[in-house]
Regions:
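Extended ligand-binding groove/face enriched in aromatic
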Residues: 5-130, 135-136, 174-176
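Extended ligand-binding clefts on enzyme/binding-domain cores
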Residues: 62, 92-103, 117-251
Length: 252
C-alpha cells in the first residue's frame, strides 16, 4: 500500500515528474523480492495444501502475487518504464541455488491462469480461503498488463463478474467476504470494511458491481445526518482485519 500511496501522489500532484518518486516505487516493488518477504509461503503451502512448492507465485498466494502485480502495473502506467517487462527482471532469489525468474508478463499470465483455473474465477490468499477483495488485485493485474501491452482481459472480467454474482453475493446484495475454495462453504459474517475497500478495486473491471455495492453500503451502512457521516458499527467491525483481533485503537 505504500507504493500505491506514492503512485497516487505522483498521479495527482506531480504527473510529469519521475525522479525520486519513481525510484521510491521501484524500491517498494523490488523489496518484495527479499527472501524475508516471501519465504513464508513454502511453509503455509506445506501445512495448508500438503504440497512442497517454495515458488511464491506459481499457485495461490494472491496476497503476494496480486498486490505485487498491481504495483508493477501502476508503476509502468505512470512512468512509461518497461524495465520489468524484460525476462528475469523480477527474480526471487534465496541463496545461489534457489531462483524463480519472473517479469511483469509472467506475473500477469499466472494471475490469468490462476483465476480462470478456479471454479470461482478467484483464488486463495491463505491456503483454501478465497477473498473477493484479494482476487480483485489479480484481476487488476491482468487489466493493467493487457492495457499496456495490447491484450484482452475480457475472459477474466466476465468470469470474475459471474462468480461474484453467483458465489460471493448474499440475497440482500451484500458481500460474501470469505469462501473456502476447497469445501465451498462461506463465512457468513464479515466486517463492513471488506466491502468498503473492495469498491474502488472493482471499478476498473466491473464498475457496475462497484456502483451497486457502494449504493447498498450508503443505504444500509452509512447514516447521513446533516453534515455528519455516521457509519453503523457492529462489534464485528471492531476487528482489525490485519491480525483478526479486537482492539480499542482499531478505529481510532
Amino acid at each position: 500500500f505504500l507504493q500505491y500511496a506514492v503512485a497516487m501522489s505522483q498521479f495527482t500532484r506531480t504527473p510529469a515528474f519521475t525522479g525520486y518518486v519513481a525510484e521510491a516505487q521501484r524500491n517498494a516493488i523490488e523489496k518484495m523480492l527479499e527472501p524475508r518477504v516471501w519465504k513464508y509461503w513454502r511453509w503455509e503451502n506445506l501445512w495448508g495444501n500438503l504440497r512442497w512448492e517454495p515458488d511464491p507465485l506459481r499457485r495461490d498466494n494472491v496476497m503476494l502475487s496480486g498486490y505485487w502485480g498491481v504495483m508493477i502495473g501502476v508503476y509502468e502506467s505512470l512512468n512509461g518504464d518497461r524495465r520489468y517487462n524484460e525476462p528475469g527482471s523480477l527474480t526471487f532469489r534465496n541463496g545461489s541455488r534457489e531462483t524463480y525468474p519472473y517479469d511483469f508478463g509472467r506475473v500477469a499470465q499466472l494471475m490469468r491462469g490462476n483465476l480462470l483455473g478456479s471454479p470461482f474465477c478467484m483464488f486463495p490468499c491463505e491456503p483454501s480461503w478465497i477473498y473477493p477483495f484479494c482476487s480483485s488485485y489479480a484481476l487488476n493485474t491482468v487489466i493493467l498488463h493487457d492495457r499496456l501491452n495490447g491484450g484482452d482481459p475480457g475472459d477474466v472480467i466476465s468470469g470474475y463478474r459471474d462468480s461474484f454474482d453467483r458465489d460471493f453475493m448474499r440475497p440482500d446484495g451484500r458481500l460474501v467476504a470469505i469462501r473456502n475454495g476447497r469445501l465451498g462453504f462461506a463465512v457468513a459474517a464479515a466486517p463492513t470494511i471488506n466491502e468498503a475497500v473492495l469498491v474502488p478495486w472493482l471499478n476498473p473491471g466491473v464498475p457496475e458491481l462497484a456502483r451497486r455495492l457502494w449504493w447498498l453500503m450508503r443505504e444500509q451502512v452509512i447514516d447521513l445526518e446533516g453534515d455528519e457521516v455516521l457509519p453503523t458499527i457492529r462489534n464485528l467491525d471492531r476487528v482489525d482485519v490485519g491480525n483478526y483481533r479486537y482492539g480499542k485503537d482499531t478505529f481510532a
